[in-house]
C-alpha cells in the first residue's frame, strides 16, 4: 500500500523474468490498488533538479529515478494511485488527471523552463499501463489478511538500512520512505499484524552510495576504498556509482 511504483520499470522486469522461463501472472504477482504511481514527470523533475543542484555543488546524489518526487506528490495528493487506472473512463478521474498535469506544467515551466506535457499523451500513457496491469491490481491488504487468517506465513522484504529512513536516518541524505521493520505491516496493508521474526542482513563492512556524511569512508585510505569497490562489487545497483 505504501509503495510508489515505476510501472514501466516493472513491466521491463516482468519481461526479463518471463524470458528466463518464469511465469508472471496475477496468481503470483499482485499490486496494491493503494500504491502510488511514479508518473512520467517524476524522472524528468529528478533529472532537472539534480542537474541544477550539481551546478552549485549541492546535489544529493539522486538515482534520478524520480523516487523523491513520486513520494512528494503522493503527500501533496498530486498523483494517481493504481486504483485510478481501473477508472480512466470516469470523467472525475480524467478531470483530476488534467488538474494535476496543469499544476505540474506550471512547475516545470516556471522552475525549469520546460515545454508543457501533453494531456492526451499522458492519458494515453495511463491507458497503456492500465491495459498491462489491470488484472494485477487488487486489495492486497485483504489478500494478506486472509492469508494470515489461514495461518499462512507472510514474509515482508525491504531494502536499505535504518540510516536511510526518512524519519530516523541521516536526514536529508535519506531515502524518501520508511526503511525500518516496524513500518512493514503498515505499508503492506496489515497494520495490526505482529512481527514474529525480524531478520537483518549485514555485511562485514558498511557501504553507501550518494552524497552525505559517511564516517567509515574517512577512516580508510583511498587504496582500501578502491579494493573494497573492486572485490566487493560496491557499486550502486541503479546507477553503477561507486
Where are these regions (language model features)?
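Non-transmembrane, aqueous-exposed alpha-helical and coiled segments at domain scale
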Residues: 1-242
Amino acid at each position: 500500500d505504501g509503495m510508489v511504483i515505476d510501472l514501466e520499470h516493472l513491466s521491463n522486469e516482468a519481461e526479463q523474468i518471463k524470458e528466463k522461463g518464469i511465469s508472471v501472472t496475477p496468481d503470483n504477482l499482485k499490486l496494491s490498488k493503494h500504491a502510488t504511481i511514479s508518473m512520467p514527470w517524476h524522472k524528468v523533475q529528478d533529472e532537472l533538479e539534480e542537474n541544477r543542484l550539481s551546478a552549485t555543488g549541492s546535489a544529493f546524489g539522486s538515482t534520478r529515478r524520480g523516487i523523491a518526487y513520486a513520494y512528494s506528490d503522493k503527500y501533496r495528493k498530486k498523483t494517481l494511485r493504481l486504483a485510478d487506472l481501473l477508472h480512466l473512463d470516469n470523467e472525475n478521474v480524467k478531470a483530476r488527471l488534467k488538474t494535476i498535469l496543469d499544476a505540474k506544467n506550471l512547475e516545470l515551466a516556471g522552475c525549469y523552463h520546460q515545454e508543457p506535457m501533453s494531456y492526451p499523451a499522458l492519458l494515453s500513457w495511463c491507458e497503456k499501463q492500465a491495459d498491462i496491469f489491470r488484472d494485477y491490481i487488487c486489495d492486497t491488504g485483504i489478500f494478506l489478511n486472509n492469508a494470515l487468517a489461514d495461518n499462512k506465513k507472510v514474509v515482508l522484504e525491504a531494502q536499505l538500512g535504518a540510516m536511510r529512513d526518512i524519519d530516523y536516518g541521516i536526514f536529508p541524505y535519506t531515502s524518501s520512505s520508511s526503511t525500518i521493520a516496524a513500518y512493514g505491516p503498515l505499508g503492506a496493508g496489515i497494520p495490526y499484524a505482529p512481527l514474529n521474526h525480524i531478520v537483518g542482513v549485514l555485511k562485514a563492512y558498511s557501504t553507501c552510495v550518494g552524497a552525505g556524511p559517511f564516517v567509515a569512508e574517512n577512516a580508510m585510505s583511498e587504496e582500501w576504498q578502491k579494493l573494497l569497490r573492486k572485490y566487493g562489487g560496491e557499486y550502486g545497483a541503479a546507477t553503477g556509482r561507486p
